[in-house]
Design a protein with these regions (language model features):
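Right-handed parallel beta-helix
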Residues: 114-115, 152-160, 246-256, 269-281, ...
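Extracellular "leader-to-stem" segments immediately downstream of a signal peptide or signal-anchor
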Residues: 16-91, 96-252, 260, 274-276, ...
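Short glycine/acidic-rich loop motifs that flank beta-strands on beta-rich extracellular proteins
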Residues: 87, 101, 121-122, 142, ...
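Active-site-proximal loop/turn and secondary-structure-junction residues that shape catalytic pockets
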Residues: 96, 267, 277, 316-318, ...
Length: 486
């Protein structure tokens, strides 16, 4: 175990160069540097962002904390000015700030004071439909409430809350609500599908769901701009989308009620997520807390995640698109985190086609997650997952598996008859190709779980078996089932 030093955003060291330029704030190490030499793999130190000693307040740009005034322009104007000045801090003071999408730019630290609540508008027309990635595939979605692309030296820090107003976006399943909650939801508007099982915020959202059936939330067909606009409510954005950014810090803030995934760094480098809280309703569809996708060098430490789907999830793209991107998620330290409700505490996949390697997970607690440690993929993905090191994990009240490897996630992969039973389909084993996922060299030790539906479940592919899984000192008590190897 390693002791995590607290982040010293408040304990700043300033320097001044010989030309008397404005002082620069250096964010000190938030983790004992010795850990890098103690890892079971070689990993360079995660670089932290730096910011000039310059700050502005969004009030000076006309922002009003009345919960009624739309502050989109004021907040983005403040960000643009700080960026134009060479960088610094944009301060969001206490108050209720209604806004549309916020675009973070290089060298900007968006700082929220205590009791600052940033509420993203329920007017979905404020979020333009853009080309982006969702669940590992290139598609079109609405712009995220918080986004950055190709930015460097960016941060969201402080003590405030960002509320994505996700209840206005998400479909909701009847079996996840009480009878009273369901009646109230249906009475609020929207539509219910033909089976009476799922509520959607609009007819357009329902159409999007129909066109996306069996295609992982991505609509099929030749669609016009008017088609996309009609389905806008289906094109739920992630709450925070950072794409191809370098030196990123999220610290201290709370992110809640996301339209789909909450935090989604994609193809980023040098990422630190420290002392962050994610709070999504347990019924939130696709309400993952953190999806770290195709990123290199990351610290995920001292966080609390409460999610409607996966808690801490490592990804790298889906199927052929992920393999062509060829960007593994690698060199990641995950320490001292707590995951409450969620479909998995620590998860790899199922979108892992670009590969996953050099992941270190230590000192984490999972309380009531559907599954504890979850590895998932299927035929068609391809990708290599290896060199995963997990230790000192404590879990309680896990309804399903404490540890699972499931290479049949999401149904049957290519090469199988969709009309056959999954196991009967194995009479003809497909050949190993680039579409075959590989899981190997995974080391798990010192895991304690009290209460589980099943202790361990391995469900591998006959053509590419799960290899070299090392388990040491795994204690699962009060489990309904023991170990199942398939």
């Amino acid at each position: 175990a390693y002791e995590i030093a607290s982040c010293l955003v408040g304990l700043e060291m300033c320097i001044r160069d010989s030309n008397n330029c404005p002082s620069t704030t250096i964010v000190e190490d938030i983790i004992d540097p010795a850990i890098y030499t103690s890892l079971p793999f070689k990993m360079d130190k995660v670089e932290q962002p730096t910011f000039p000693d310059y700050s502005v307040n969004i009030i000076d740009f006309g922002a009003k904390p009345d919960g009624i005034t739309l502050n989109t322009k004021a907040i983005n104007d403040a960000i643009q000015q700080v960026n134009a000045k060479g960088g610094g801090k944009v301060i969001i003071p206490e108050g209720l700030w209604l806004t549309g999408p916020i675009e973070l730019l290089s060298n900007v630290n968006l700082y929220t004071e205590k009791n600052a609540l940033v509420l993203f508008s329920a007017d979905h027309s404020l979020y333009p439909i853009i080309n982006t990635s969702f669940e590992g595939l290139e598609t079109r979605r609405c712009q995220s409430p918080i986004s950055a692309r190709n930015a460097e030296n960016i941060a969201i820090t402080g003590h405030g809350v960002f509320d994505g107003n996700g209840d206005t976006w998400r479909p909701t399943k009847k079996d996840k609500l009480t009878e009273g909650q369901w009646k109230k939801l249906v009475a609020s508007g929207g539509v219910v599908d033909a089976d009476g099982r799922i509520w959607y915020p609009s007819e357009g959202a329902l159409k999007g769901a129909i066109l996306s059936k069996d295609n992982f939330n991505v609509p099929r067909g030749e669609l016009t701009d008017s088609d996309w606009d009609y389905m806008r409510d289906w094109l739920r954005p992630v709450l925070l989308s950072f794409i191809k950014c370098n030196k990123v810090l999220l610290e201290g803030a709370t992110f809640k009620n996301s339209p789909s995934w909450c935090l989604h760094p994609l193809s980023c480098e040098n990422i630190t997520i420290n002392k962050v809280t994610v709070s999504n309703p347990w019924y939130s569809q696709n309400g993952d807390a953190l999806d770290l996708e195709s990123c290199n060098k990351a610290l995920i430490i001292n966080n609390s995640f409460d999610a409607g789907d996966d808690g801490i999830c490592i990804k790298s793209g889906k199927d052929e698109q992920g393999r062509k991107r060829g960007e593994p998620c690698q060199n990641v330290i995950v320490m001292n985190n707590t995951v409450l409700h969620g479909h998995g505490g620590f998860v790899v996949g199922s979108e892992m086609s670009g590969g996953v390697n050099n992941i270190y997970v230590d000192n984490c607690t999972f309380m009531g997650t559907d599954v504890g440690l979850r590895f998932k993929s299927n035929r068609g993905r391809g990708g290599l997952v290896e060199n995963i090191y997990i230790s000192n994990i404590n879990m309680i009240n896990i309804p399903n598996e404490a540890l699972i490897f499931n290479l049949y996630y999401g149904g049957k992969g290519r090469g199988e008859d969709p009309n056959q039973d999954e196991k009967k389909a194995e009479t003809t084993i497909p050949p190993v190709t680039e579409e075959t996922p590989i899981f190997r060299n995974i080391f798990i030790k010192d895991v304690t779980c009290n209460g589980a539906g099943r202790a361990v479940f391995f469900n591998g592919l006959p053509e590419m078996r799960i290899k070299n899984i090392n388990m040491e000192n795994i204690i699962v008590s009060n489990a309904k089932e023991g170990v199942v190897l398939s």
